[in-house]
Structures are given as C-alpha cells and as structure tokens.
Amino acid sequence: MADETKATLGTADILEVMKLLPHRYPFLLIDKIIEIDGDSSAIGIKNVTVNEPHFTGHFPDRPIMPGVLIVEAMAQTAGAICARNQGEGGHLVYFMTIDNARFRRPVVPGDRLEIHVVKQRQRGNVFKFHCEAKVEGALVAEADVGAMMIPEGQ
C-alpha cells in the first residue's frame, strides 16, 4: 500500500523547481522537492552550506541560518505547490501573510532542512498553508503562511 501511495506523489529536481519559481541565487532557497501530492502538500529540501552569503554576517563566529530565510524557504515550497498546479500560463505567487511563527532551534551549515507544507485552505487565488521545518526529524521552525497567485504583469 505504501508503494502505491508513493507512486502517486510527484517530485521536482532543481531544474523543475527553477521552472516553478522565479527566484534565483542567492534567493532560491529550495534545492529540490522530494514529495508533492497534487495541490495539497509538499516536502522541500534545503541543504544548508557555509558558502551562503548571509553567513558572513549572521554570525561570523557562529553561523546560524536567519529565521526569515527559513520562513522564505517555507513560502517557496508552498509557492511551488501553487505554481505546479496552475500549469502553463505565466502566474506569480506572492507571499502575503505569516502567522504563528515559532523558531525552536538554530539551523546551521551542514544541516539538511526538510520543509513540510500542507495546504489548509484555498479561496479563489488565495491560499493558506501550515509549514514545518525539520532537521533530522526534529522540528526547528513552524509557521502559517498565506499566498496569492496572480497573472504575470499585474
């Protein structure tokens, strides 16, 4: 049964992620999506490396991934769900709200950030997602994010 379920789920390597999201280095924060279930959920991966530019100042002697970038990685994973299900047609996903953000422990270079996103609701082109970021199965951050999908150029 688990194999059947796994077969219905999609994935996205970095090239597919780059087709789904307009972000580019240094602000593309998702390396791949290991699981995407229609328009309801996804698991994104961010491999945290010391070579990322924010670590030069946050903090020089003890590099910690800024919480706002963890939330941005959550929003990008949610955006990939929206974009993938929109199909062709030139739409952009705008991050609208963040609620209930909690940061449980630092994320440091060498960590593999696993971002779990579940759609809570959708009304027209407005979406609400619950997001959890984990390292080695331990919850490091969580938030509820809102997004809006609009046609490009508006």
UniProtKB/Swiss-Prot annotation:
GO biological process: fatty acid biosynthetic process; lipid A biosynthetic process
Presence of the UniProt keyword Cytoplasm in the record: yes
Signal peptide: none
GO cellular component annotations of the record: cytoplasm; membrane
Record's keyword terms, sorted: Cytoplasm, Lipid A biosynthesis, Lipid biosynthesis, Lipid metabolism, Lyase
One Pfam family hit: FabA
Function: Involved in unsaturated fatty acids biosynthesis. Catalyzes the dehydration of short chain beta-hydroxyacyl-ACPs and long chain saturated and unsaturated beta-hydroxyacyl-ACPs.
Name of the protein: 3-hydroxyacyl-[acyl-carrier-protein] dehydratase FabZ
Encoding gene, per UniProt annotation: fabZ
